[in-house]
C-alpha cells in the first residue's frame, strides 16, 4: 500500500489532467502552510492567557514549556527531513497534518490530564510541554517544510513567481490568524477554538 501511495499516478494519473498540475500543487502548498498556523508562534500565542488560567501556570512557566518544546522539536527535524526524502511530500504532509490535529486535541485536554495525576504545576508543565513539542514539530516544522518543498519540485523556470505568490497568501493568512483565533476564543472558549 505504501509503495502504491508513493507512485506519482496515485490516486489518479496527473498526465491526464488537461492543465499543468503544478498550479494545483501551488494551491495545496499554500493551504499546507496555512494549516500549520496552530504550530506557529502567532497561532499559539493567542492561547496564552486561557492556558495560564486552565493550567495554573505562571506566564514564565508557560513560556519555558514553549521554549523547551520548540527546542526539543528542532532536534528531531533533521530526522523528519530524511523521512521526507524517503517517503515523499504527499505522505509527509498527510501524516504531519493528522499528527498536528491530534496534538491540538491533546493540548485541549492538558488541564484534565494534569488533574488525573493530582494536578499541580509539575504535571501541567509536562503535559503542555509535550503538546508544544508536538505542535511545533508537526505544524511549524514538518508540515511547513514539506509544503514548501513539494512546490519546488513542480517548478523550475517560474519558481520565484510561484514562491512569491504563495508568500503573499501565506503572509495574509498569518496576519489574520491571531484575529480569527481570538474571535473564536471570545465566541466559544479556548478548547473549541484550538480544535
Name what the model sees in each region.
Residues 66-73, 166-174:
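Structural signature of transmembrane alpha-helices in multi-pass secondary transporters
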Amino acid at each position: 500500500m505504501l509503495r502504491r501511495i508513493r507512485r506519482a499516478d496515485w490516486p489518479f494519473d496527473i498526465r491526464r489532467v488537461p492543465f499543468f498540475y503544478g498550479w494545483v500543487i501551488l494551491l495545496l502548498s499554500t493551504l499546507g502552510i496555512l494549516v500549520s498556523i496552530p504550530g506557529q508562534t502567532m497561532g499559539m500565542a493567542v492561547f496564552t492567557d486561557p492556558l495560564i488560567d486552565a493550567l495554573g501556570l505562571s506566564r514564565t512557566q508557560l513560556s519555558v514549556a514553549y521554549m523547551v518544546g520548540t527546542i526539543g522539536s528542532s532536534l528531531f527535524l533533521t530526522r523528519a527531513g530524511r523521512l521526507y526524502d524517503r517517503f515523499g511530500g504527499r505522505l509527509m504532509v498527510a501524516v504531519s497534518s493528522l499528527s498536528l490535529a491530534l496534538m491540538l486535541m491533546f493540548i485541549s485536554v492538558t488541564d484534565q490530564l494534569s488533574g488525573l495525576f493530582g494536578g499541580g504545576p509539575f504535571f501541567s508543565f509536562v503535559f503542555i510541554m509535550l503538546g508544544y513539542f508536538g505542535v511545533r514539530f508537526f505544524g511549524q516544522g514538518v508540515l511547513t517544510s514539506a509544503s514548501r518543498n513539494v512546490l519546488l519540485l513542480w517548478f523550475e523556470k517560474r519558481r520565484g513567481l510561484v514562491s512569491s505568490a504563495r508568500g503573499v497568501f501565506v503572509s495574509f493568512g498569518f496576519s489574520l490568524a491571531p484575529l480569527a483565533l481570538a474571535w473564536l476564543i471570545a465566541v466559544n472558549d479556548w478548547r473549541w477554538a484550538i480544535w
